[in-house]
Curated annotation (Swiss-Prot):
InterPro entries: DUF520, UPF0234-like_C, YajQ-like_sf. It comes from the Bacteria. The lineage of its organism: Bacteria, Pseudomonadati, Pseudomonadota, Betaproteobacteria, Burkholderiales. Gene3D superfamilies: 3.30.70.860. Keywords: Nucleotide-binding. Pfam families: DUF520 (PF04461). It comes from Janthinobacterium sp. (strain Marseille). One of its GO terms (cellular component) is cytosol. SUPFAM superfamilies: YajQ-like (SSF89963). One of its GO terms (molecular function) is nucleotide binding. Belongs to the YajQ family. Nucleotide-binding protein. NCBIfam families: PRK05412.1. This is Nucleotide-binding protein mma_0840.
Length: 161
C-alpha cells in the first residue's frame, strides 16, 4: 500500500551556511563598523547580538535574506523576546522548530479525514504518515495539504509504493 511521511524539519547544513554568510556580510558592512553585531549558532538555537534594537533588526534582516537565498523556510524560525545585556547592547534568541507538534499533527489528520479522500493519516512521533490505495490519491493529498496548511513548512518524504 503506497504511503508517505509529512514532516517539518529545517536543513541544518543550509542554516549553518546562511549563518556563516550573514556573519561575513555583517563584518564587512559599513553600518556595522565598530559595533558588536553578530549571529551565533548552537545546535538549533541562533542568537543575534547588536548595539541597539534598530541594528538587531538589520542583523535579522540580513540573516533572513541569507536563509531565503539558501531555500530555508523562515517559518522554521521562532523568535524570542529582545533582551538587554549590559549598556545599550541587545540580543535575541531564535529557536529553529523541528518536527510537527501534536496539535498541528491532529489538525493535519483532521483536514485529511474531512476531505473525504481515500487515504488514511496516522501520527507517528513528530511526523504524519499518510497511506492510500493509489498513488494518485496520495499526490492529491499532498497538493491539498500544501494548500490547506499554510502556517507550517511541510515536506513530504519516505514515499513508498
Amino acid at each position: 500500500m503506497p504511503s508517505f511521511d509529512t514532516v517539518s524539519e529545517a536543513n541544518m547544513v543550509e542554516v549553518k551556511n546562511a549563518v556563516d554568510q550573514a556573519g561575513k556580510e555583517i563584518s564587512t558592512r559599513f553600518d556595522f563598523k565598530g559595533s558588536d553585531a553578530r549571529v551565533e549558532q548552537k545546535d538549533r538555537d541562533l542568537t543575534a547580538y547588536a548595539d541597539s534594537e534598530f541594528q538587531l533588526n538589520q542583523v535579522l534582516d540580513v540573516l533572513t535574506g541569507k536563509l531565503v537565498k539558501r531555500n530555508v523556510d523562515v517559518r522554521f524560525l521562532d523568535r524570542g523576546k529582545i533582551e538587554k545585556i549590559g549598556g545599550d547592547k541587545v540580543k535575541q534568541v531564535i529557536k529553529i522548530k523541528n518536527g510537527i507538534e501534536t496539535e498541528a499533527a491532529k489538525k493535519i489528520v483532521r483536514i485529511i479525514k474531512d476531505s473525504k479522500m481515500k487515504v488514511q493519516a496516522s501520527i507517528q512521533g513528530d511526523a504524519v504518515r499518510v497511506t492510500g490505495a493509489k498513488r494518485d490519491d496520495l499526490q492529491a493529498a499532498m497538493a491539498m495539504l500544501r494548500k490547506e496548511v499554510a502556517d507550517l513548512p511541510l515536506e513530504f518524504n519516505n514515499f513508498r509504493d
